[in-house]
Amino acid sequence: MEVNILAFIATALFILIPTAFLLILYVQTAAQNN
């Protein structure tokens, strides 16, 4: 099976970017609540 590096990077970014965005929002909300 051939590994497509661009597809792997695109998938990683597609998963990591929303996760990081939600994580930042969660941290900001938690900081404001405290």
Swiss-Prot record:
Lipid bilayer topology: Single-pass membrane protein
Record organism: Angiopteris evecta
UniProt keyword annotation of Secreted present: no
Major localization class: plastid
Function: One of the components of the core complex of photosystem II (PSII). PSII is a light-driven water:plastoquinone oxidoreductase that uses light energy to abstract electrons from H(2)O, generating O(2) and a proton gradient subsequently used for ATP formation. It consists of a core antenna complex that captures photons, and an electron transfer chain that converts photonic excitation into a charge separation. This subunit is found at the monomer-monomer interface.
NCBIfam families: PS_II_psbM (TIGR03038)
Biological-process GO terms, alphabetical: photosynthesis, light reaction
Quaternary structure (record): PSII is composed of 1 copy each of membrane proteins PsbA, PsbB, PsbC, PsbD, PsbE, PsbF, PsbH, PsbI, PsbJ, PsbK, PsbL, PsbM, PsbT, PsbX, PsbY, PsbZ, Psb30/Ycf12, at least 3 peripheral proteins of the oxygen-evolving complex and a large number of cofactors. It forms dimeric complexes.
UniProt protein name: Photosystem II reaction center protein M
TM annotation in the entry: 5-25
Family recorded in the similarity comment: Belongs to the PsbM family.
